[in-house]
């Protein structure tokens, strides 16, 4: 499994105005110690406290390589990322609000805490599904049975609606609509039998 660890940070600009500058180096060390002390693989979820003024990025070539060395596989941030090609080469995946050209003076403020990114509250250790489309934070307590449900629904789609749609060649309009309607009914009945609800095509 992949554990989720959270971080909030400032990327204050100009550098001289960063209220965390004096102890920034020690904060970085403590943050790395925190990440290093947790078994991987890990995803770091970062709340940028300066947004929408994301003048700099915590994530770039250097931090991507550091975090890969610390057992991290990706990050989700409502701030910015940079050095996208270099991050890819490091093997660190990322979902971010935007790109930027510099790192400014980015300082970790809190870690191991609840954060809010893209309107979603995320707690340390919370299960997350993430891909190129975005991410979902799974509510605590809902993890059990999730894999079984996902596999079932995928197979249900493939055996009903998708199967019918892919086999539509040569059917008349009337035949196609009849088969589609039946496949939707079959999908709903299978979902209802499994979960007590007809799913996405239900009432």
Whereabouts are the PLM-identified features?
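Short, small-residue-biased leader/transition segments that mark boundaries at the very start
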Residues: 1-6, 11-13
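A short acidic, glycine/proline-enriched capping/turn motif at secondary-structure boundaries
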Residues: 16-19, 50-53, 81-83
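Short, charged beta->alpha transition segments
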Residues: 25-37
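Extracellular/luminal Protease-associated
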Residues: 34-77
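A short secondary-structure junction signal
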Residues: 56-59, 78-79, 87-89, 106-107, ...
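A contiguous pocket-lining binding segment that forms or flanks enzyme active sites
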Residues: 77-78, 84-135
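A hydrophobic, small-residue-rich beta->alpha segment in the mid-to-C-terminal subdomain
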Residues: 127-170
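Glycine- and charge-enriched low-complexity intrinsically disordered segments
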Residues: 159-200
């Amino acid at each position: 499994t992949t554990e989720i660890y959270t971080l909030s940070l400032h990327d204050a600009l100009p550098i001289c105005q960063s209220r965390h500058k004096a102890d920034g180096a020690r904060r970085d060390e403590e943050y790395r110690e925190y990440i290093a002390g947790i078994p991987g693989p890990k995803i770091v979820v970062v709340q940028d406290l300066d947004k929408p003024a994301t003048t700099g990025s915590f994530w770039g070539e250097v931090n991507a390589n550091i975090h890969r060395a610390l057992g991290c596989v990706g990050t989700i941030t409502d701030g910015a990322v940079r050095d996208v090609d270099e991050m890819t080469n490091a093997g660190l995946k990322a979902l971010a609000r935007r790109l930027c050209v510099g790192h400014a003076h980015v300082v970790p403020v809190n870690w191991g805490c609840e954060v809010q990114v893209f309107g979603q509250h995320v707690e340390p250790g919370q299960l997350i599904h993430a891909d190129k489309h975005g991410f979902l934070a799974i509510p605590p307590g809902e993890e059990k049975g999730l894999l079984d449900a996902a596999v079932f629904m995928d197979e249900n789609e493939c055996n009903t609606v998708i199967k019918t749609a892919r086999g539509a060649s040569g059917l008349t309009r009337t035949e196609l609509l009849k088969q589609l309607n039946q496949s939707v009914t079959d999908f709903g009945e299978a979902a209802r039998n499994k979960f007590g609800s007809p799913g996405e095509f239900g009432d």
